Amino acid sequence: MNICIIGDGLTSLSLAKNLVNKKINVHFYHKNKIEYLLSSRTIGISENNFEFFQKEIHKIAKKKFWPIKKIEIYSEKLVQEKLLKFESNKNSLFYTVKNDDLYKSMISEICKNKFFKKNIIKDNSFYEKLLKKNKYDLIIN
């Protein structure tokens, strides 16, 4: 099976990684050279999704993730009044990870996989050419 994925975000990369783990050919298209932007962006992953991600998609060192066991939400209008409070003494509610750390780790590993091929979209006629070639079982944009 041949799958085409268009886009270079974490969602596309996670899907591509999961497919190549299942020995499915993936052609990964993106508009320009992927550059790593140093940013402070983080993403949150629930406990169950974290376990699934580690097992099925990409294992990343646990030291790169920060466990969150307590969340408090306040109102700007009501000073010092908690709107919601979530807390767990045993398990983490979710984990946060730097967006760049996860992306770099995944892209460096997936590029070594023989089922993965990365391509650059050079112009807007790419989409028409892609459809005419008809060499993919599924195209995901």
Predicted feature locations:
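N-terminal Rossmann-fold NAD(P) dinucleotide-binding loop
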Residues: S12-L13
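Conserved N-terminal helical subregion
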Residues: W66-N141
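Glycine-rich FAD pyrophosphate-binding loop
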Residues: C4-D8, K17-R41
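Extended amphipathic secondary-structure runs
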Residues: N21-H27, N48, K55, N113-N119, ...
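A generic structural signal for short, well-ordered alpha-helical segments in conserved domains
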Residues: A16-K17, I107
